Design a protein with these regions (language model features):
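Hydrophobic membrane-insertion alpha-helices, especially the h-region
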Residues: 27-43
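Sec-dependent signal peptide cleavage junction
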Residues: 40-61
Length: 273
């Protein structure tokens, strides 16, 4: 996307979105200036410079998670990290996505957005898309309160940001696809999973698309155990299309947990630990 076009779209952001971006850029600028004094050179060095690398390592996106497992079947019980990387290696620090050759080929043909039908327990299934500048949304999200995803038993806690334990969590974020009250795209997710874990990777995806104008193959699968109404977590995968994953690539499992709260995943009931 060209700079002029990005400027026009950015102008439509809500004040809250602008404030978040301003704060992130301000933080990066302050740290970049400080590192320049220490390391020497100009803050306008290329992305490969020592300053840029140091800035990315400090204020990046919180995506450099040290916990990694070989496969989705090896996910450990939650301890203190909100997500784990799957099949990570030197070229894929945030995990290697498992898209098939056919899925990658489909992504090269054009954008698509598909959601699974709800199952017999009214649970969501996999959400799958090719995202790009044509799918990003800068409009204010509409109300989604009309949707009550499976396991929605809301209680409030003083130690949870915003009070409510649960969010109506988009599998594919509204900012990435423009979907609002789509029951096939909303699950019962904890505040921690929705705003700390998933948002980390959603923001990476949006920034990559905005910065490059390229496309991203993207898949999110809620992970339910048999008969349970609340997902134990979500499996998120992404791979940039035009550069074969060189610009963006992740395969992570985000835990649907909230520190200090015990959740009955069968019913959605919950209480302070």
């Amino acid at each position: 996307m060209g700079k002029a076009n990005r400027g026009k779209r950015t102008a439509r952001r809500t004040s809250k979105q602008r404030a978040k971006r301003w704060l992130r850029n301000m933080s990066a600028g302050i740290i970049a200036g400080a590192l320049t004094l220490v390391l020497g050179g100009s803050p306008a060095l290329s992305r490969c410079s020592r300053v840029q690398s140091a800035v990315e390592s400090i204020v990046g996106t919180s995506a450099s998670n040290t916990v990694s497992v070989a496969s989705l079947g090896d996910i450990p019980e939650y301890s203190d990290s909100l997500w784990v990387c799957i099949d990570a290696d030197g070229a894929h620090a945030q995990g290697t996505p498992s898209f098939s050759d056919e899925e990658v080929a489909r992504a090269k043909q054009g954008s698509f957005l598909q959601f699974s039908d709800l199952d017999s327990l009214s649970r969501c299934g996999t959400a799958f898309a090719r995202l790009g500048t044509d799918t990003l949304s800068y409009e204010e999200r509409q109300s989604i309160r009309s949707v009550y995803p499976s396991g929605w038993v809301q209680h409030r806690y003083s130690f949870v940001d915003g009070g409510g334990l649960y969010n109506r969590s988009h599998l594919i974020a509204h900012a990435l696809c423009g979907e609002n009250a789509n029951e096939k795209n909303l699950i019962t997710g904890t505040r921690a999973m929705n705003t700390e874990a998933m948002t980390t990777f959603e923001n990476q995806t949006a920034r990559y698309i905005e910065d490059t104008g390229n496309h991203v193959l993207y898949r999110v699968t809620p992970m339910f155990e048999e008969g349970e109404l609340v997902a134990r977590g979500v499996h998120m995968e992404a791979q940039s299309v035009e550069d074969g994953g060189a610009g963006l690539s992740f395969n992570v499992y985000c835990y649907n947990v909230q520190p200090g709260v015990t959740i009955d995943y069968t019913t959605g009931e919950n209480h302070a630990t």
